[in-house]
């Protein structure tokens, strides 16, 4: 069997089986175009004990999601996602008790994390570009590098296909939001093409629970345009080239509950990559990849002076912040006859960041990494698959990190299995932590170019299985996870040269412990239900309090009705969040959790061929009022700080139309 045939088989089976534990499980097919080692890495890791969940494009369309964040929020077990103020906003993410910056984001395997603050948000990734989303849980630093501490989220863009086809869709919602999108794909001989584009605009809703009179811009609006092109060429059955380019232009409000007249980010973002896959023989395959991620943002903050309402320019339009991240990698797979196969690779990253808004000196960081993994061959062991690997990283200034992991899966029977991943991961300091120079005139903390990477030890252990039930299977998985983080980077006050604090590697170990249970079951021929519950205990060294911005517990549940060959489908999803703490300097620690939201969706096909469809969705059906963030502003009358809540999405109605061709 050739390498490409093996990849296609593994990827298809594992992508479909991974769907059994999320609401993505109702999909009719998952398009997997296994054109390189990079494409099928998540699916292959699942075979060796890594937990991988998948959302398909069809599930995204059926539920009426317009951006990546909302789809992840409701669909993936164990992943807490909290958009600040609805679609296309910054998000808080916690995967198995992690911080936002502990999760690596990728587009077609290309890292898109914002290393300025180590907390990149997918706030400009529209749903139209999605073929599927793959979520890998647990330490994923071996192949993916820094920030894969708790896992990785890979957004796979529209796949190639030989037959011409595509989609056009439009929608509008009750927050004065409008969406227009489409894509097309096909092939001319050995040349394959995909093009996609989308435009989203919304006036938004009032994002805070109270405003000072000086805040005159009170609705968070957005406008986003995204275009993308993919090109693939088969030089032969064994040599393939894939090229991706995607461009995003966005204007996103960045308002406050006091003094705001105009405040926004105007962003231009480019993501480009090229991959060359070469099967030298049936046993040896190589992948060469280069990438560029260029992020340029023009920021403006114009305020009103309380009382007089005189215009005050804090940051004039054109104030710059952004970064450029480029690099390359090589990966080789050697699978000789026998019981073992080998993977070897090299990564190079060059990163430059500059911020005039949050003063960060323009510095360049380079990272070189060598990694390898040894795996048991597909049929080497009757019921088990095992893998182990090592990665060495060396960055600018001699900063080093070495990580490893060992993983495996054992099928106790056809209906019961156990799997585990044990290893280490690392997190490089952000540009802010290294090079922040402080705001002139303020008593401000400082960056520290001598910081060492954070180091973590991770264990994931799962037991799962399935039982035949009706025409499908009842599937379940119970996962326990543990993570210890050393050399945590935080602001310290021990150095007398920095009385206002300086970033340092603090003493002590942050401990994360938790468990996740997910089940999925058919309820007759047309109905399916799924549910998950996650509990996390995340503590700083010497503390008995839950770390802020990480929920103690949360749960998700969904129900779908999708009869085969019927013209009508419907779904419901529930999202419950337990105790979740935020802290402000004036008001201390507060609990903003303990809320639940319900979404409903439905769509009907207008023709026998199911090319035309109309859908409706209702987000937050009961108009639950809940906070996603806490902040404080100064009262206009000078009486001091005022606590304000940033509110989640209110009850929102959406209408959708789509045409497949």
Show which residues each predicted segment covers:
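Short acidic/polar hinge/loop motifs at secondary-structure boundaries
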Residues: 92, 110-137, 448
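N-terminal periplasmic "start-of-domain" segments of outer-membrane beta-barrel proteins
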Residues: 29-63, 92, 100
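Membrane-embedded beta-barrel scaffold of Gram-negative outer-membrane proteins
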Residues: 283-301, 411, 418-419, 452-506, ...
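Extracytoplasmic beta-strand/coil segments of soluble accessory domains associated
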Residues: 69-110, 131
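A beta-strand signature from Gram-negative outer-membrane beta-barrel systems
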Residues: 124-169
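C-terminal beta-signal and adjacent terminal beta-strands/loops
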Residues: 34, 205, 426, 576-582, ...
């Amino acid at each position: 069997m050739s390498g490409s045939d093996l990849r296609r088989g593994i990827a298809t089976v594992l992508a479909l089986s991974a769907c059994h534990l999320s609401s993505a499980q109702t999909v009719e097919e998952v398009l997997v175009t296994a054109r390189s080692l990079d494409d099928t890495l998540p699916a292959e890791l699942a075979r060796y004990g890594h937990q991988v969940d998948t959302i398909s494009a069809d599930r995204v369309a059926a539920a009426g999601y317009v951006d990546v964040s909302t789809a992840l929020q409701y669909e993936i077990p164990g992943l807490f996602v909290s958009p600040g103020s609805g679609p296309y906003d910054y998000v808080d993410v916690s995967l198995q008790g992690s911080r936002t910056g502990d999760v690596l984001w990728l587009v077609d395997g290309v890292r898109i994390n914002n290393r300025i603050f180590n907390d990149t948000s997918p706030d400009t990734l529209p749903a139209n570009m999605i073929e599927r989303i793959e979520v890998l849980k647990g330490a994923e630093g071996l192949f993916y590098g820094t920030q894969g501490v708790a896992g990785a989220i890979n957004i796979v863009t529209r796949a190639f296909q030989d037959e011409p086809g595509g989609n056009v869709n439009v929608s509008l919602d009750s927050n004065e939001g409008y969406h227009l999108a489409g894509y097309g794909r096909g092939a001319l001989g050995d040349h394959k093409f995909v093009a996609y584009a989308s435009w989203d605009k919304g006036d938004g809703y009032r994002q805070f629970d109270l405003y000072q009179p000086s805040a005159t811009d009170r609705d968070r609006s957005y406008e986003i345009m995204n275009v993308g092109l993919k090109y693939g060429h088969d030089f032969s059955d064994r040599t393939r080239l894939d090229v991706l380019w995607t461009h995003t232009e966005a204007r996103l409000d960045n308002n406050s509950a006091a003094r705001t007249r105009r405040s926004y980010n105007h962003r231009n973002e480019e993501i480009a990559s090229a991959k060359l896959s070469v099967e030298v023989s049936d046993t040896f395959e190589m992948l060469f990849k280069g990438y560029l991620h260029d992020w340029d943002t023009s920021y403006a903050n114009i305020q009103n002076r309380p009382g007089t309402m005189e215009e005050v320019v804090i940051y004039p339009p054109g104030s710059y912040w952004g970064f450029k991240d480029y690099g390359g990698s090589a990966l080789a797979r050697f699978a000789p006859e026998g019981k073992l196969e080998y993977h070897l690779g090299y990564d190079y990253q060059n990163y430059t960041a500059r911020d005039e808004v949050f003063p960060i000196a323009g510095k360049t960081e380079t990272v070189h990494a060598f990694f390898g993994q040894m795996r048991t061959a597909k049929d080497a062991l009757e019921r088990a698959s095992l893998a182990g690997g090592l990665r060495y990283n060396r960055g600018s200034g001699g900063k080093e990190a070495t990580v490893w992991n060992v993983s495996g899966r054992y099928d106790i029977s056809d209906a019961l299995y156990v799997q585990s991943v044990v290893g280490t991961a690392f997190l490089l300091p952000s540009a802010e932590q290294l090079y922040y120079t402080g705001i002139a005139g303020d008593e401000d903390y400082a960056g520290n170019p001598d910081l060492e990477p954070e180091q973590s030890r991770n264990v994931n252990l799962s037991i799962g299985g399935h039982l035949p039930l009706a025409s499908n299977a009842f599937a379940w998985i119970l996962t326990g996870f543990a993570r210890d983080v050393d050399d945590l980077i935080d602001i310290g006050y021990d150095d007398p040269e920095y009385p206002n604090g300086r970033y340092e590697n603090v003493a002590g170990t942050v401990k994360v412990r938790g468990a996740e249970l997910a089940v999925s079951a058919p309820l007759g021929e047309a109905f399916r239900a799924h549910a998950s519950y996650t509990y996390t205990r995340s503590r700083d060294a010497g503390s008995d309090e839950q770390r802020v911005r990480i929920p103690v517990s949360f749960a998700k549940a969904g129900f779908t009705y999708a009869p085969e060959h019927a013209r009508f489908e419907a779904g419901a999803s529930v999202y419950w969040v337990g105790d979740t703490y935020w802290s402000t300097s004036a008001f201390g620690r507060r609990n903003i959790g303990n809320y639940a939201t319900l979404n409903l969706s439905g769509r009907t096909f207008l023709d026998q061929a199911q090319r035309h469809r109309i859908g409706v969705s209702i987000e937050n059906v009961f108009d639950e009022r809940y906070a996603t963030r806490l902040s404080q502003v100064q009262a206009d009358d000078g009486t001091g700080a005022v606590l304000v809540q940033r509110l989640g999405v209110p009850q929102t109605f959406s209408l959708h139309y789509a045409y497949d061709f």
